[in-house]
């Protein structure tokens, strides 16, 4: 006589399924990947949108939930699931790493440097791009270039207020360095009326253009595409690309954003980190060859005017270069002169702290 399956049978089946799913979950790690709505992170957004079109690269992203969750696929097999996290700035990215709420991310090299100096266990993996930063004034401002800005700052009766999106952002640090080299006294204290320029923290990129439009600040300094968007919306004018700041040639090919990973992620999932670095490096090369399409895809992803994204003059780097390292060393010098470093980076050059800042084993293995 046939007996109905008992409770024990169902318990055993449930346990078996749990074990199978547990093994599967262990094989496919779920990692949180942070990025910012900026054209500096175009390669990651392009990789997500192109998907299987990049299959020939040997590594690509397959959407699970578009713009939210993706599988990292290698030779047709998923090796990880990426949960995308949009951050407001490099400073927030570093803070999320410190709280163990990110595994991989893209952010400015200066933000990652600052985080590592504070003791956050993470490493720079590879470069993303150089340049793509500008100083923007309101459309009706009489200022036309760097020299007219300096003249105005020296004659103004109170500090000229310039907004930035993050205290550890590359645009803010470059501008501050250039101002000081030009003999301009800079402060972040609104009560310091002896200064000629007041730098104001606007907290995130989305606040920059509204602050400029409302005359909350007299200028903004930030990464692409925000200077270009200000122009496209008729709100502002770019009076200087930061690469052209004095001294002549000093700021050319200056580093900005990088990829980074927590030390824990590197230790636990080196195979995933390797393929993530490979994907970004190969997509960087693709973006350099397909600038128009890359700009269009970025505009669609972020929700920008297409002309603004396409106007970004960025150079994406598949590998570290000598000029990139020289620029990173200049950042170290500037940040030390400002007294920003209190930890292991204090008083050091880039060569002295490479093992502290970088894990280059992954990018060194990438064949383009």
Predicted regions and their residues:
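Short helix-initiation/N-cap motifs at beta->coil->alpha
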Residues: 65-95, 108, 186-214, 223-225
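Immediate post-signal peptide segment of exported/extracytoplasmic ligand-binding proteins
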Residues: 24-32, 55-57, 77, 143-161, ...
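Secondary-structure end/capping motifs
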Residues: 267-342
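Short, polar/charged alpha-helical segment
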Residues: 30-31, 37-81, 86, 91-92, ...
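A conserved helix-loop-strand patch within extracytoplasmic ligand-binding domains
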Residues: 109-110, 121, 127-210, 214, ...
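Conserved C-terminal helix/tail region of periplasmic/extracytoplasmic solute-binding proteins
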Residues: 336-368
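Pocket-lining segment of extracytoplasmic ligand-binding domains
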Residues: 110, 204-298
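Bacterial N-terminal signal peptides
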Residues: 10-19
């Amino acid at each position: 006589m046939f007996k109905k399956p008992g409770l024990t049978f169902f318990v055993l089946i449930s346990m078996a399924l749990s074990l199978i799913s547990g093994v599967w979950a262990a094989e496919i790690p779920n990692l949180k990947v942070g990025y910012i709505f900026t054209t500096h992170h175009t390669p990651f957004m392009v990789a997500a949108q192109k998907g299987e079109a990049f299959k020939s690269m040997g590594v690509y992203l397959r959407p699970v939930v578009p713009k939210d969750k993706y599988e990292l696929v290698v030779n047709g097999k998923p090796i990880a699931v990426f949960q995308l996290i949009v951050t407001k700035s490099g400073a927030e990215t570093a803070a999320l790493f410190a709280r163990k709420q990110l595994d991989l991310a893209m952010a400015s090299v200066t933000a990652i440097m600052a985080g590592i100096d504070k003791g956050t266990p993470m490493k720079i993996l590879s470069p993303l791009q150089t340049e793509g930063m500008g100083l923007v004034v309101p459309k009706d401002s009489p200022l036309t270039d760097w020299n007219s800005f300096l003249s105005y700052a020296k004659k103004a009766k109170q500090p000229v207020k310039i907004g930035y999106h993050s205290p550890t952002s590359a645009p803010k640090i470059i501008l501050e360095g250039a101002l000081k080299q030009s003999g301009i006294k800079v402060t972040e204290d609104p009560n310091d009326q002896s200064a000629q320029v007041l730098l104001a923290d606007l907290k995130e990129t989305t606040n920059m253009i509204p602050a400029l439009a409302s005359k909350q600040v007299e200028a903004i300094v930030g990464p692409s595409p925000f200077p270009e968007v200000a122009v496209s919306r008729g709100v502002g004018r770019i009076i200087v690309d930061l690469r052209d700041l004095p001294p002549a040639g000093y700021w050319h090919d200056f580093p900005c954003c990088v990829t980074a990973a927590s030390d824990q992620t590197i230790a636990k999932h080196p195979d995933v980190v390797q393929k993530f670095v490979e994907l970004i490096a190969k997509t960087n090369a693709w973006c350099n060859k397909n600038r128009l399409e890359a700009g269009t895809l970025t505009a669609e992803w972020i929700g920008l005017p297409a002309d603004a994204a396409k106007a970004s003059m960025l150079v994406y780097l598949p590998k570290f270069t000598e000029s990139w390292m020289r620029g990173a060393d200049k950042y170290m010098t500037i940040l030390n002169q400002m007294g920003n470093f209190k930890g292991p980076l204090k008083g050091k050059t880039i060569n002295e702290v490479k093992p502290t800042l970088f894990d280059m084993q992954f990018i060194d293995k990438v064949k383009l």
